């Protein structure tokens, strides 16, 4: 009898801890909504809130017109765990801070360890936005090139920008080539791209142009549909989200 009671208390404690963690993660999502970091769409997985789906849209510099899918992986003990969240791109991305073997983005220079209550996911997304807008500055901020995830990309950026730009364009083209691939998961929160269809998407585009919004995806988490489904519809050949910004 005592063992049953102890087991029940343990289960209740675990349930409360899970609920508390879910609340913290939801709070992170709400903060991302309020910050409105342009050009980045994210949403937690329906099946596992520790995994987030994201899409990055480059709007300037070397990465202008880029579309990169990525995942955010939170540690099991988030946000108390001092381990920083992991950002992993789905395709190869040429950048000094992106490992060419694992496609993971190194954020340790800005977030050496996770400080609960001080560090937030919207700051990670903002950092991501900044280092893609100016990769050369991110090299300077790191200091030693040997600490960079992609030393070769760093050397090219500082010595032969044309060659670096060419490699970046190759990675952008590769990513765009897979934009309409069948989703690797059945998770309903996975961000899906649909080819532009005038009869379906035309009215939505017209509403946006006229200043009226509809239930659309969350740009940096910003205000998805009530069901939590997240989708982005892009005009064929443009790869730009149908958003007001």
From Swiss-Prot:
One Pfam family hit: UQ_con
SMART domains: UBCc
Cross-referenced InterPro entries: UBQ-conjugat_E2_core (IPR000608), UBQ-conjugating_enzyme/RWD (IPR016135)
Domain of life assignment: Eukaryota
UBC core domain: residues covered: 20-177
Family: Belongs to the ubiquitin-conjugating enzyme family. FTS subfamily.
Protein name: Protein crossbronx
